[in-house]
Curated annotation (Swiss-Prot):
Major site of localization recorded for this protein: membrane
Keyword terms: Cell outer membrane, Lipoprotein, Membrane, Palmitate, Plasmid, Signal
Subcellular location: Cell outer membrane; Cell surface
Lipid group attachment sites (S-diacylglycerol cysteine): 17
Coiled-coil residues: none
Organism phylogeny: Bacteria, Pseudomonadati, Spirochaetota, Spirochaetia, Spirochaetales
Record-stated family: Belongs to the OspA lipoprotein family.
Residues anchoring lipid (N-palmitoyl cysteine): 17
Protein's UniProt keywords contain Endoplasmic reticulum: no
Superkingdom of the source species: Bacteria
Tagged with keyword Chaperone: no
SUPFAM superfamilies attached to this UniProt entry: Outer surface protein
Name of this chain's protein: Outer surface protein A
């Protein structure tokens, strides 16, 4: 009888070892929050291989993996119904997640999204050649840059989605250019690959008395607009990804009133009139 009970106990123990990842629940695991509004279950105990089991559910797909650490970091993988493969990489400090979708071969990327703890993210989609065809960069404040129809030379269409309005333009290998037009005036906001912003204004008005010119101050991120040698207004492109406008007095010598945040595209156009 004792041998029988010992045999049953051994079988149950082996079954428990084989279950590993598939048997995680709230009793034998800890849930860890991750960037991107995800969470991962981490086993409280090590498995038979001396590692901690991990389970995460992404878009209703269960991903499984193991890790030497019990803090939730590691690599998890799964396979979709269409046989495409999904890989979730969680950084050691839990500050970043990388979600990748591959074709059936497990090598050709379909999409990739990197999300940080501050809620900023970069999402990319790839064409049949494995080249980036679409890209969305979301900042921590929720504003974002959207790129579509990206070609092999790095060119494409661009949008900057700000609070209340959208700027549209183009992408090149060197920079993003977002344009606002009003009458004869064209305002161009340039964003370099490193994220540095510069703004310029071009006016095709042939009359010197009404033609607008502008000077950009990179130190204060301010575009000062001048008409007939008099300053008329300042447009400030803030680090918080907002734009403010403030008027100069009639002599064009000093600012008056307070800077007002622009919340509509028409307000930018009015500032260019």
């Amino acid at each position: 009888m004792k041998k029988y009970l010992l045999g049953i106990g051994l079988i149950l123990a082996l079954i428990a070892c084989k279950q590993n990842v598939s048997s995680l629940d709230e009793k034998n695991s800890v849930s860890v929050d991750l960037p991107g509004e995800m969470n991962v279950l981490v086993s409280k105990e090590k498995n038979k291989d001396g590692k901690y089991d991990l389970i995460a559910t992404v878009d209703k797909l269960e991903l499984k993996g193991t890790s030497d650490k019990n803090n939730g970091s590691g690599v998890l993988e799964g396979v979709k119904a269409d046989k495409s493969k999904v890989k979730l990489t969680i950084s050691d400090d839990l500050g970043q997640t990388t979600l990748e979708v591959f074709k059936e071969d497990g090598k050709t990327l379909v999409s990739k999204k990197v999300t940080s703890k501050d809620k900023s993210s970069t999402e990319e989609k790839f064409n049949e050649k494995g080249e980036v065809s679409e890209k969305i960069i979301t900042r921590a404040d929720g504003t974002r840059l959207e790129y579509t129809e990206i070609k092999s030379d790095g060119s494409g269409k661009a949008k900057e989605v700000l609070k209340g309005y959208v700027l549209e333009g183009t992408l090149t290998a060197e920079k993003t250019t977002l344009v606002v037009k009003e009458g004869t005036v064209t305002l161009s906001k340039n964003i370099s690959k490193s994220g540095e912003v510069s703004v310029e204004l071009n006016d095709t008005d042939s009359s010197a008395a009404t033609k607008k010119t502008a000077a950009w101050n990179s130190g204060t991120s301010t575009l000062t607009i001048t008409v007939n040698s008099k300053k008329t207004k300042d447009l400030v492109f803030t680090k918080e990804n907002t734009i403010t406008v403030q008027q100069y007095d009639s002599n064009g010598t000093k600012l008056e009133g307070s800077a007002v945040e622009i919340t509509k595209l028409d307000e930018i156009k009015n500032a260019l009139k």
